[in-house]
Regions:
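Sec-dependent N-terminal signal peptides
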Residues: 4-15
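A cross-kingdom feature marking solvent-exposed beta-strand/loop segments within repeated
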Residues: 38-40
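SH3-family beta-barrel domains
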Residues: 19-36, 46-51, 56-132, 139-147
Length: 147
């Protein structure tokens, strides 16, 4: 009896943890079609034109992923257009620093909505890079995967 209860409780904890995990992916190309449904037969809803843009997977069906972006736009993207890379978007303007402290040298001002590639995270800071800059940013008000 105890063994059955233990198995049920363990299964419940495992499945609830697995279901609550957020999955973030990034766009593989600089032009990605988002469709109304999970098939090439569905019309294109809109087109992303930002490589590495972080998106959140909210459902999947075969090779299709239902996604949501930081502006709450949603639709279906074929899995061949997605990749696993830690990218993030600041939800407000931020300062990029040379080291993970506000007392270090400011490197650049990062505008809201700019795609950043996450290199490393320590405490409340993430080391990120853009096309032009590399440095540390506080990880508050970031949308995407920050690990």
């Amino acid at each position: 009896m105890f063994k059955k209860i233990f198995i049920i409780i363990t299964s419940f904890i495992f499945f609830s943890t697995a279901l609550s995990e957020e999955i973030f992916l990034s766009l593989k190309k600089d032009k990605v079609n988002v469709r109304y449904g999970p098939s090439f037969e569905f019309p294109v809803k809109f087109v992303y034109k930002k490589i590495d843009l972080p998106i959140k997977q909210i459902d999947k069906k075969e090779n299709w992923r239902r996604i949501k972006d930081f502006k709450n736009n949603s639709g279906w993207i074929h899995s061949s257009q997605l990749k696993r890379i830690n990218s993030t978007i600041p939800l407000n303007d931020k300062i990029l620093f040379d080291k993970p402290t506000i007392f270090s040298k400011p490197v650049a001002k990062i505008k809201k909505g700019r795609v950043l590639i996450v290199q490393d995270c320590q405490n409340n800071w993430c080391e990120v890079k853009t096309d032009n800059f590399k440095g540390w940013i506080e990880n508050s008000n970031l949308w995407g995967e920050v690990k």
